Amino acid sequence: MKEAVLSGKSITKAFGENTVLHGIDLDIYAGDFTVIMGSSGSGKSTLLYSLSGMDRLSGGQVFYQEQDIANASENELTKLRAGNFGFVFQRTHLISNLTLGENIQMAGLIGNLSDKETKMRTDELIERMKLEKAKDRLPSQVSGGEAQRAAVARAVINKPVILFADEPTGALNKANSEEVLNLISSLNAEGQSVLLVTHDREAALRGNRILYLEDGVIIGELDLPVYEGKDKTREEKLSVWLEGLGW
């Protein structure tokens, strides 16, 4: 039986009179690559932010290691996220006056790593993300793909339990998207739990568990084998499933 590393119970989120999430129950399992799909405005990103404690709930609970993070203080949430959650967004949010290497290193220094561990981990990730030539450049001096690979490195330098990724390839061309997705898939293959929000089928195919959100409610779930490369059967299963949901 799979172990749930994060559990949402009756998650409800409203902005004023507009209810975006309607009592969602959702477990995120250790080692899974979970994907949340849905049309624009369905509540995908809001669900990710609610599960990670970045958005306060209007109702419900979210448990991480038996702690109800939905009702935790900001100080408690900051400490919890620093060592347990990593985040990648469509925009990289890299610090503009720091090099890519410094951006990665800073995340380790403010996390749970010693100076020595931070240096070793930074060097390891720069090599893994193929950033050797770009590490000493500012974000404005590199390509979108290089910047996003640095953002992935920054997100995982503290070896988080869960990597939250909100449309990480949304602003990238096909080649750069493929590169970033390959990196996230390789991390998942080593046991990294991933929660990815996307509207892109190519990105969704990386998941082994795909959820479809419509009007703030999960209306479908598809289980796939662990991703091992492009596979026509996998693509057909996803297409048939999405067509059945009216995508």
Placement of each model-derived feature along the sequence:
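ABC ATPase C-loop
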Residues: L131, K135, A155-V156
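Helix-to-loop junction immediately C-terminal to a conserved catalytic motif
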Residues: S52
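Conserved signature/switch motifs of ABC ATPase nucleotide-binding domains
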Residues: R137-S140, I157-N158, E190
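Conserved ABC ATPase "signature" region
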Residues: D68, Q105, K116-K133
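Short coil-to-helix segment of the ABC ATPase nucleotide-binding domain corresponding to the Q-loop/switch region
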Residues: L98-A107
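Conserved ABC ATPase signature
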Residues: L138-V142, E146-Q148
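Catalytic Walker B motif of ABC-type/P-loop ATPase nucleotide-binding domains
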Residues: L163-D166
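Conserved ABC transporter NBD signature motif
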Residues: G60-D68
